[in-house]
Design a protein with these regions (language model features):
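NAD(P)-dependent dehydrogenase/reductase Rossmann-like domain
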Residues: 169-170, 209, 248, 262, ...
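FabD-like malonyl-/acyl-CoA
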Residues: 1-139, 184, 188, 265-293
Length: 293
C-alpha cells in the first residue's frame, strides 16, 4: 500500500483532545509541555478539559488542533508515508510531521496565524457558506456574477464547496445558488472570510513570520492547498504557504492528485473524521482510517 497521511483543519476539535496521548507517552508529554511554554499559557488545560466553548476561540482552536495532530504523528511509531497533505490549518501540521519545519517553529507560526486571523475577522468582517450539490462550474459562475466580493474558498469534494467573502455578497450568492439548483446553502458559524482576499491583513502579518522561519526539505512530498501539487523544495513550500490564507483550498484536486500518484491508503491524523468523509466522496475505492488518540 502507498500511504498518505492527511491532517484536519479548524472545526475538528473536541473536549479532552490529546489527554490519553499525554498520559500514555512520555515523548508526547514533553512536546505538549513545550507547547505550553511556547504559547505562554497552559493550552493543554483547555484541550484536556470538558468545555467545548473554551476550545472555540481561534487563538486556542488552531494551536490545539496542530498540537494534537503533530504530537500524534510524531509519537505513535508511524512509518514515513509516501506523501502528506493537510486541509487549511492542517497544512502546517503536515509540514511539521514531515519535517519541513520543527515542531516549535511550526507552532509559533500557527499561533501567529491564529492571532492574525482573529484580528482580521474583527477589522474586516466577512462570512462563509457551504454550497451542497451544485456543479463547481456553476458555483464559480454565480460567485463571479455577484455584486460584492465572494469566491469559492474550499473545494472540499465534488458535492461540497465553501464560498467566502463580504457578508452581503455571500448572502446574495447563497440565494442565487439555491435558484440555480443547490440542495442547500448553509451559512457557517465564522466571523471572517477565510481563504479570500479579505484575509490580506492576516496574510501580511503571517508572511513576516514565515519569512523568518527556517524550512528544510520534508521526508516526503507535501501536497499543498494552493496548487494541489506535491512539493519538496523548501522555497516552493514557503512560497505556497505565503499564499494560503488568501487563496482557495483545492482539497478535491489534492486528493485526486495523490490517488493519481499512487496513494491507496489515507490515514487522517488528528481530531475528527471530516477528511475521511471527504476522501470517501472523492476517491471511494481507497482505504481510509483515522488516528485520533
Amino acid at each position: 500500500m502507498s500511504k498518505a497521511y492527511i491532517f484536519p483543519g479548524q472545526g475538528s476539535q473536541f473536549p479532552g483532545m490529546g489527554k490519553a496521548l499525554y498520559e500514555r507517552s512520555a515523548e508526547a508529554r514533553e512536546l505538549m509541555d513545550r507547547a505550553n511554554e511556547i504559547l505562554g499559557f497552559p493550552i493543554t488545560d483547555i484541550m484536556f478539559g470538558e468545555s467545548a466553548e473554551d476550545l472555540k476561540a481561534t487563538r486556542v482552536t488552531q494551536p490545539a488542533i496542530f498540537i494534537h495532530s503533530v504530537v500524534l504523528a510524531l509519537c505513535s511509531g508511524l512509518e514515513t508515508p509516501a506523501m502528506v497533505a493537510g486541509h487549511s490549518l492542517g497544512e502546517f501540521s503536515a509540514l511539521a510531521a514531515a519535517g519541513a519545519m520543527s515542531f516549535e517553529d511550526a507552532l509559533k507560526l500557527v499561533a501567529v496565524r491564529a492571532s492574525a486571523m482573529q484580528k482580521c475577522c474583527e477589522q474586516v468582517p466577512g462570512s462563509m457558506a457551504a454550497i451542497i450539490k451544485l456543479p463547481t462550474e456553476t458555483i464559480e459562475e454565480v460567485c463571479a456574477s455577484c455584486s460584492g466580493l465572494v469566491i469559492p474558498a474550499n473545494y472540499n469534494s465534488e458535492g461540497q464547496v465553501v464560498i467566502s467573502g463580504e457578508a452581503e455578497a455571500v448572502a446574495e450568492a447563497c440565494k442565487k445558488m439555491m435558484e440555480a439548483g443547490a440542495k442547500r446553502a448553509l451559512p457557517l458559524p465564522v466571523s471572517g472570510a477565510f481563504h479570500s482576499p479579505l484575509m490580506e491583513p492576516a496574510r501580511l502579518e503571517l508572511a513576516e513570520a514565515i519569512d523568518k522561519t527556517p524550512f528544510q526539505a520534508p521526508a516526503c512530498p507535501v501536497y499543498q492547498n494552493v496548487t494541489a501539487l506535491p512539493a519538496t523544495d523548501p522555497d516552493v513550500i514557503k512560497a505556497n504557504l505565503l499564499k494560503q490564507l488568501t487563496s482557495p483550498v483545492r482539497w478535491t484536486q489534492t486528493v485526486q492528485n495523490m490517488v493519481a500518484d499512487g496513494a491507496d491508503y489515507f490515514l487522517e491524523i488528528g481530531p475528527g473524521t471530516v477528511l475521511q468523509g471527504l476522501v470517501g466522496r472523492i476517491a471511494p475505492d481507497v482505504v481510509k482510517e483515522g488516528l485520533s488518540e
